[in-house]
Amino acid sequence: MKKILLMLLLCTPLLYMGCKAEPEWVNLIAQQEQEKGQEEEQEEADSEFKWANLADSCTTVLINQFMNKPKGTFWATPANESNNSGNIYWQQAHAMDVVIYSYQRIKDKNPSLADTYENYFKLWYDNKANNYDKGDTKYGTTGFGNRFTDDMCWICLTLIRLSEATGDDTYINMAKTVYDTQIITRAWEDEKGKGLPWKELSVDKTRNACTNAPGCLVAAKLYLKFQDAKYLTDAKTLCAYVNANILKSDYRVGEPPLTYTQGTFGEACRQLYHITQEQSYMAIAEQVISYAFTSTRCTNKGFLRDEGTDMNQSIFKAVLIPYVVNLVLDDAASGTVRNTLTLKLQDNAEALRKNMDRTLWPAMYCNYYWGSSFNSANIASMGAQASGASLMEGVARLEAAQAK
């Protein structure tokens, strides 16, 4: 094509002597060559693109902009700009989960960064994950006890993940203590079954999805580690309570359906399937997790919706994503479900990638809704950043699995 263009350009002065303007077809060929070059450059760039690189960027922003590094805990806004981070406890679990997945991904190729991450883990643990109730002995002496039962469940799940990632049982042993002394001791039973209350019994006995789903998962994980039958009994009991009283016929986990409870209950059922080999658990796991991506109650224009901007709502998707990836990577799950969820994750990741403004680095923030860009005139949210970074770490896990 370039040789043809050169010959045509050489002939042009002879054919069009005295004309100041280039013939239209010459300009058209030049334009086509330019567009072709741009397309080739874009194809080359796309072929070199790695989700792991974008995961690095998003997680780095989460750490550098939102972590109180001397304590290993997270602020609600960059450098605590809004001065409103004192009461965020359960959210600390899901921000740290992002760092844990990053740690697992990079530890072999970047030991120095892995050491830095391990130090953050210890600081987070030593500072009791920013627990505002840590000094109240009414909730035990571990420093992780809290008036909210669900908050303790979320924190215990991250303590368990820390042990799974590092091999240090300090964390899961603490989770066991908190569960044994402060979580399961609050469970109460009536004609509806036995379940966990949202808060301490003297304050609020409500048994909801956001407490019983993670409580069930904690019990299942403790059983896998310690092989104590009481944990399996607890997991089955709490799962049965959710099935009987909270799960809807269309697989909404409560009303309104929220991504974090859809994901957590799905993961609890998936774990129970692998413990018991009872197919009914896997069937529920597939349905409730799929609901988060296929129902318009949880999506907006095909992407996971903006569930709210406060610190309780903005971090919901950070809870969901790892459990979706776990299901996709589970060979025991339906191939159709796994393929569908893979495409949904990729679509959401591509949307977030498209809508992140890299020119704003290091303030390259994720929006609450991945189908649009973050407004840099607003104050960024740790919850939104953790959710976006969780998505990127998740698709990076899929990318690594596919490369094997």
Report residues per predicted region.
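Positively charged n-region of N-terminal signal peptides that target proteins for export
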Residues: M1-I4, K20
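Bacterial N-terminal signal peptides
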Residues: M7-L14
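Bacterial Sec-dependent N-terminal signal peptides
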Residues: L15-N53
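CBM-like carbohydrate-recognition segments
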Residues: E44-V98, S102-D150, R207, S280, ...
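Extended ligand-binding groove/face enriched in aromatic
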Residues: A114-L222, L232-T233
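Active-site cradle of extracellular carbohydrate-active enzymes
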Residues: T206-G215, A219-Y223, Y231-L272
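Oxyanion-binding "anion nests"
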Residues: T261-T276, Y281-R297
